[in-house]
């Protein structure tokens, strides 16, 4: 009998099958096995994104690739509608940002991977033509196993498929180190703030075994208070609560004298974690709340064998494809204080409309040129 990989090599055709809810389970099972996937590829994140910005009229066009009866790849894909200079334009995006790049099966040879990727992007191009999509953008996660399984520096893989580079950088902390080593790699001020915070307040982790609706509701209400408004649909908070209940996230909480000071929600998947969301009581801005939230989360993640923690994007200064505000620069500086290394956040885009391409690139050039002379962080 032939091995599955050999059978797939012999099969020429790759069939595209739209993702429907009855296939959610096998899609998510595939995500657990693909070297290219992380939480962003799952139906959990897909459903969250479909609820995140309803004004964009998001619609899933996600699809699977089947070859010789087996799933060989998945492509999360959402079409969203934007208003730009008085016109409505469709894009393949994820809640206003780049979507997860295709993920392939772990048993494919290099030759078959190329064939499958060619089929995937041909289908994306076909959908773009049918729907008159102006632009498609994808990103790859540094928490996916394939990102780390390389022996030499790599170029953005999506450039091979007709996409243009819009990559950024993100900070990833290696949690396999001992706690004292992690502390030594932090900025001196961060270590001092963690020590001070530990003496002032209580930090707790709510996971699937300890989260309750009442505890999560406290996070949602503080999130509203900190932002001064409700920032997104209630359904997205319910989904986050379900993630914690299902072991896909944890909630780091800080209290002082029985009052909530802050929360941080950390997505957890496979052997990686991502700093997804946080809020702090604006009445206590003088306290190092964020420092203790992150440190307590890192301790929990280490305890449960999470190896990599992506604390978030690094914005040192503006790029043509991303203008950095002072607030974003300060947030990046805060995140770097916890140590770790800056790694590529591979992102890529492809324009399907020449007029839309010209408008976007001219707009970027005007905004970027206005930043010339700004200080570099």
Write out the residue ranges for each language-model feature:
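Conserved acetyl-CoA binding element of GNAT-fold acetyltransferases
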Residues: 86-108, 271-282, 312
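A gly/proline- and charged-residue-enriched helix-loop-helix capping module
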Residues: 93-147
């Amino acid at each position: 009998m032939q091995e599955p990989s050999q059978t797939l090599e012999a099969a020429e055709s790759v069939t595209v099958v739209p993702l429907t809810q009855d296939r959610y389970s096998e899609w998510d099972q595939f995500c657990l096995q693909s070297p290219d996937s992380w939480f962003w590829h799952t139906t959990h994140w897909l459903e969250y994104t479909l609820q995140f910005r309803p004004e964009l009229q998001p619609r899933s066009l996600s699809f699977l690739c089947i070859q010789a009866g087996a799933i060989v790849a998945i492509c999360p894909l959402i079409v969203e509608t934007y208003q730009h200079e008085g016109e409505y334009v469709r894009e393949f995006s994820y809640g206003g940002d780049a979507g997860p790049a295709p993920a392939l099966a772990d048993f494919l040879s290099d030759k078959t991977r190329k064939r499958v990727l060619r089929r995937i992007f041909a289908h994306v191009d076909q959908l773009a033509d049918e729907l008159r999509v102006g632009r498609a953008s994808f990103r790859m996660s540094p928490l996916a196993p394939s990102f780390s399984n390389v022996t030499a520096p790599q170029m953005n893989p999506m450039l091979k498929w007709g996409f243009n580079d819009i990559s950024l950088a993100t900070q990833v902390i290696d949690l396999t180190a001992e706690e004292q080593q992690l502390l030594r790699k932090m900025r001196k001020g961060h270590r001092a703030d963690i020590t001070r915070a530990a003496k002032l307040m209580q930090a707790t982790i709510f996971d699937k075994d300890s989260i309750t609706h009442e505890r999560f509701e406290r996070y949602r209400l503080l999130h509203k208070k900190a932002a001064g408004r409700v920032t997104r649909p209630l359904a997205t908070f319910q989904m986050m609560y379900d993630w914690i209940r299902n072991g896909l996230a944890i909630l780091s909480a800080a209290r002082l004298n029985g009052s909530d000071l802050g929360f941080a929600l950390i997505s957890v998947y496979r052997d990686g974690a991502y700093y997804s969301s946080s809020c702090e009581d604006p009445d206590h801005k003088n306290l190092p709340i964020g420092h203790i939230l992150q440190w307590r989360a890192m301790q929990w993640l280490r305890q449960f064998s999470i190896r990599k923690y992506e604390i978030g994007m690094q914005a040192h200064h503006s790029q043509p494809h991303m203008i950095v505000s002072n607030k974003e620069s300060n947030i990046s500086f805060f995140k770097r204080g916890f140590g770790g290394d800056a790694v590529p956040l591979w992102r890529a885009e492809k324009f399907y409309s020449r007029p839309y391409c010209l408008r976007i690139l001219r707009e970027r050039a005007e905004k970027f040129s206005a930043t010339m002379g700004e200080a570099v962080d």
